[in-house]
């Protein structure tokens, strides 16, 4: 008994490094056992919610102390978020679950400026974090009465099969006019920082994926929520906020014929979305998750540059990995296509395995390459998709005022983010003394850009848009075609 106790104490202090273990994410060749210690920020005697708005954990990775700061992802669900499944007689059953006290967080590592994290705290800590340029996955070990977690690099997870997995979207790399045009555009520093955009997302799960997880709706819901939380984190550098509007699970049968040809399935899904799903609830983009093995080692497909189109703002993704993170990368990849991004050319793009790589890599990144950012900027400038311009209404998202959650909420003059924001006071979410604005195409260094400066170039027969000198936003020209 004494020997067992001593071993337990030693494990709590000194991380254990193992050679191989089977986790929920698969068979991991090299991992480290850690015991995250929660550091509470609540005042003594305060009532503790089930999931706090902010949390901090300490543990060791490679012998070095790590402090993980987490903040609840406040804008992750719309206030009218709904879940739909079907009864055996075909009736549609829709519920509106309370998701305010959810368990999905984003964050960073203390003293690592380039770090990021996307963590589910529902049952232990599960997700990923970037530390000193390396992406690590973390998940709880299924040991009784233990706080043990495994930390490991993605490349240390054994492949589920040897076949290369790739996106089915193709393009001609002889033409990279989009990138050339993007570099020729006159962009202010504020425009180069990407304007804020908002995407209301609908996720549909086909019958094959439902049965794959033992027809367990709760398991499906948890997996999808983790995916969307990961997508949100990956899109943050582009200043895109993702809000999940609905989850539709085909629990009894498929409502389209899910075929092995991914583009054909995407076309059928787009038709169904236009006829059925959009009539249930307004949203900007929908993705179908399926257990179908697409032909030609394809794991996803989406239309290029069709965000906001009622039929074509869709993607189809195979649930190709037990690792939530990897499927979330594929979903983000297909979303990127809808936002005008083509595949990374390994000879032209400064990223070995970024999100828009055509083939999944052993060292898969969660970053968008410079090429992807250029494509996205060009898409925003040339196509100006309208559905993602507007933030969800203050009554549309489950949130209490909190700085840096990417939504302008009741009582806020600006969404301040970090305390270092020169325009916005992080403590009050009010503009700092002397500041006129904090964001927008007509805001530069906290001041309105003078009247008459072009803030949005014309497209086709339209006219240029100009700053008016009294707002940080770029007003639409009233004479647009």
Curated annotation (Swiss-Prot):
Keywords: Cell adhesion impairing toxin, Disulfide bond, Hemostasis impairing toxin, Hydrolase, Metal-binding, Metalloprotease, Platelet aggregation inhibiting toxin, Protease, Secreted, Signal, Toxin, Zinc, Zymogen. The active site is at 334. CDD domains: ZnMc_adamalysin_II_like. GO terms for biological process: proteolysis. Zn(2+) binds at residues 333, 337, 343. Its cofactor is Zn(2+). The keyword Lipid metabolism does not apply. Its main location: secreted. InterPro entries: Disintegrin_CS, Disintegrin_dom, Disintegrin_dom_sf, MetalloPept_cat_dom_sf, Peptidase_M12B, Peptidase_M12B_N, Reprolysin_adamalysin. SMART domains: DISIN. Residues 197-392 form the Peptidase M12B domain. A motif (Cell attachment site) lies at residues 459-461. It is an enzyme of class 3 (hydrolase). PROSITE patterns: ADAM_MEPRO, DISINTEGRIN_1, DISINTEGRIN_2, ZINC_PROTEASE. Expressed by the venom gland. Residues 400-481 form the Disintegrin domain. The disintegrins belong to the medium disintegrin subfamily. The sequence shown is that of elegantin-2a. Disintegrin elegantin-2a-f: inhibits platelet aggregation induced by ADP, thrombin, platelet-activating factor and collagen. Acts by inhibiting fibrinogen interaction with platelet receptors GPIIb/GPIIIa (ITGA2B/ITGB3). This is Zinc metalloproteinase/disintegrin. It comes from Protobothrops elegans (Elegant pitviper).
